[in-house]
Every structure is written in structure tokens, then in C-alpha cells.
């Protein structure tokens, strides 16, 4: 079983894309600092009231545009603020019992990054040139994005650079990392980097973005603690949308297998996908959250999903804006449109917090048709929860413990 520090047993994350949340300009046009992180700080109490114990941040390092085109790993993006702003947010989160996770974009950098500029100036056969990947004099890029230049992960100097970055921010007080596009990096790279980080910070939690593949083998080979459970994400929304719980049952069977090897990172929304409420409606989104709250793993709630925000992922410039929205200045400025969904999230996450063993839960199907699914979720030695999902006439959820209803979507 992959490593899991004790504090992660209770981790429920509020996943935020900072540049969108605070309404930062789309591109970094100057180095003038705008102190926008205070905007996010005003929402920390909301995260706590929601039932979360962690703030999972998208990119905060200086970048050319969307945060995944890093310019400087040791500098806070001026559109968000400066070191003092970040330290204040970190301290405020910790004071509320919220751990803080950062997004480490170590597969690629901006074409404007000093690493790339030095490589181009010095040539591919130089020490600087070997920091990035190239072929026949052309820089390798990430998934066809010409502005995203791939780092050369076979180079020990790149391993040392990434290790230094991770240790630096852990030293600043960060509790964990999401490794962006971890699926594009040879697991041997992570296996070389992560032990040096854990040697100094043994309680750090590190999970990778992995979409396809043998999750358990990737975790084992890389030394990462966990990976994102995209198979389950697909199984949840697709089974509700198509009214086919056989797909969810299959996904939960796979989830049980993965959970024998590591503790998966679970979610129904993130900064890269169409909003769950846009896929399955508001009631369907609550049903999806009920699944998330009652299965094994470490759940992440994407900001706005708890308020029934909608947004569709598109393939064009600026296509992510709809799913990475600006939030109001404070919770007091919210409308009442998402109030019912918020209350449902709070009560479901409260249920999960009262049953901390759910992090290790396994599910078992009790009754299965296309439109109705009943499963048992539990661990040895505890009273299990019985979860009933029904999409025959709308979407409804009933959760029982020892024969008593402990949560109902109609309550």
C-alpha cells in the first residue's frame, strides 16, 4: 500500500484555480504586483463551513498566461500578489485547520522561461540546452501547444531543479503537491525526485495527474502517493447522464482494486472538465456528490460545484474561462441560486467527516438496474452505510446506517 501520512486520513479538499477565482488578467503583461490573493483569503471560512480540511490550489507561480506556462518557479505570479500575500494566505489557511496543496507544473515550461531562452542561446549540446527536450534542432512541446516546452526529464540537472523547487515551497509551509501532467513524465523521474523531498519533509502528500493507464503500477513505479481517479469521474457523470448504473458499478469495482494499492484522489469536477451541473443538472450533481462522499479515497470539491455553477469546456482560445470563473468578493455577495446545493454539500461532507473510515471504504453492489443502484460501503469492523441511488423519476439519494436514514436528497 502506498504511503499516506496521518493528516491525509481526514483530507477533503476545496480545489481552486486562483487566476480565475480572483479575476486576474488573461496574460502577464507587466511585473507590477496586484494583491489579489486577499480575494481568495476572504473565502477560507467558506471552505471550512463547506466541510473541507484542505485548500488545493491551482498554479500560483509566475506564468505567461494560464498558470501552466511557468516563467519562474520561485516567484508568486504578480497577477496574484507577492511573497507576503502568499505567506498570509498560507498562515490564514493553517490557522483554520486547512492544509495547503500546490500545483507543480514540472513537465513543461513557458517558451519565455529563462530555461528555454538559455537553451536556445547555448545550443542543444550545451548544459543549458540539455535542460529541455529537442529533436533535430526543434524544441519538443507538450501535446501540440507551441508555447509549452517540454523539460528533459532524463537530465539529472532537471531532477535537481525540480527537487529544489519542491523543497523550497515545502520549507515555506506547503503541505502537499499535485503533479501536473504526471502521465507525460517517465515514472523513473519521480522515483528519483520524490525521495529527496520526503527525506526533508516526510509528511508531504504528493499525487499526480494521471488520466489513463494502470494507476497502481504508475503509483508503484513513480513513488507518488496517489493519482487522480479519472476512471471513476467518468463512471459517475456518465452513469447519471445515460441512466446506466452498470457503468458506475464497473467503475466502483475498479476503484476497489485501485484502493488496495493506494488511496485515490476522487472528484466530480476540476479546472479541465465541463461542470458536473452542466452535464447532469443540479439534482444530478448532488447525486454525484453523494457518491463522492460515500466511497473510499480522498475527495476534492472544485470551487463553484458546491454552488451548482455551470460551465462547458470548449476547444478554443479562452475556452477554459467558463469553467474557471471569477468568484464574488466574499460569500456575502452570493445569490441564493445555489443555496440548496450548498446545503447538500455541507451535509454530505459532514456525514463523511463523522465517518472518517470512509477514506478506506470498499463498496459492494446490493441491487443493480439501469436506473437504480444500491451499494454497501464500509470497512471491516464498522457498521456500513447503505447508499440507494435512483434516477427513474429525477435523481434521488437515500443513505442508511443500521437501518436508519442518515441522509436523504428529499430532506
Per-region residue spans from a language model:
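Hydrophobic faces of well-ordered beta-strands that scaffold small-molecule active sites
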Residues: 12-15, 55-57, 100-102, 177, ...
Amino acid at each position: 500500500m502506498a504511503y499516506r501520512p496521518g493528516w491525509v486520513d481526514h483530507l477533503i479538499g476545496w480545489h481552486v484555480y486562483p487566476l480565475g477565482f480572483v479575476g486576474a488578467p488573461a496574460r502577464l503583461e507587466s511585473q507590477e504586483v496586484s494583491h489579489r490573493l486577499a480575494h481568495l483569503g476572504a473565502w477560507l471560512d467558506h471552505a471550512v463551513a463547506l466541510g473541507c480540511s484542505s485548500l488545493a490550489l491551482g498554479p500560483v507561480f509566475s506564468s505567461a498566461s494560464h498558470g501552466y506556462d511557468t516563467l519562474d518557479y520561485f516567484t508568486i505570479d504578480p497577477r496574484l500578489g507577492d511573497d507576503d500575500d502568499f505567506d498570509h494566505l498560507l498562515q490564514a489557511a493553517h490557522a483554520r485547520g486547512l492544509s495547503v496543496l500546490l500545483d507543480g507544473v514540472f513537465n513543461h515550461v513557458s517558451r519565455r522561461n529563462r530555461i528555454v531562452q538559455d537553451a536556445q542561446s547555448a545550443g542543444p549540446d550545451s548544459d543549458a540546452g540539455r535542460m529541455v527536450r529537442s529533436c533535430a534542432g526543434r524544441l519538443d512541446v507538450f501535446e501540440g501547444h507551441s508555447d509549452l516546452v517540454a523539460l528533459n526529464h532524463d537530465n539529472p540537472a532537471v531532477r535537481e531543479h525540480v527537487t529544489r523547487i519542491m523543497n523550497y515551497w515545502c520549507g515555506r509551509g506547503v503541505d502537499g503537491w499535485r503533479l501536473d501532467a504526471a502521465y507525460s513524465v517517465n515514472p523513473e523521474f519521480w522515483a528519483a525526485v520524490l525521495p529527496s523531498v520526503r527525506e526533508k519533509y516526510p509528511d508531504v502528500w504528493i499525487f499526480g495527474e494521471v488520466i489513463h493507464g494502470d494507476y497502481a503500477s504508475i503509483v508503484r513505479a513513480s513513488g507518488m502517493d496517489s493519482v487522480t481517479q479519472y476512471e471513476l469521474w467518468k463512471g459517475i457523470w456518465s452513469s447519471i447522464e445515460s441512466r446506466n448504473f452498470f457503468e458506475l458499478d464497473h467503475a466502483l469495482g475498479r476503484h476497489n482494486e485501485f484502493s488496495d494499492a493506494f488511496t485515490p484522489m476522487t472528484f466530480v469536477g476540476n479546472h479541465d472538465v465541463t461542470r458536473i451541473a452542466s452535464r447532469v443538472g443540479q439534482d444530478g450533481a448532488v447525486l454525484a456528490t453523494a457518491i463522492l462522499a460515500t466511497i473510499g479515497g480522498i475527495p476534492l470539491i472544485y470551487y463553484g460545484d458546491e454552488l451548482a455553477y455551470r460551465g462547458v469546456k470548449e476547444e478554443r482560445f479562452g475556452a477554459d474561462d467558463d469553467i474557471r470563473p471569477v468568484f464574488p468578493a466574499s460569500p456575502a455577495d452570493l445569490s441564493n441560486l445555489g443555496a440548496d446545493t450548498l446545503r447538500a454539500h455541507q451535509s454530505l461532507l459532514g456525514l463523511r467527516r463523522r465517518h472518517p473510515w470512509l477514506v478506506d471504504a470498499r463498496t459492494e453492489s446490493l441491487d443493480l438496474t439501469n436506473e437504480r443502484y444500491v451499494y454497501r460501503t464500509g470497512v471491516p469492523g464498522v457498521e456500513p452505510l447503505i447508499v440507494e441511488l435512483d434516477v427513474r423519476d429525477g435523481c434521488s439519494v437515500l443513505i442508511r446506517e443500521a437501518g436508519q436514514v442518515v441522509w436523504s436528497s428529499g430532506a
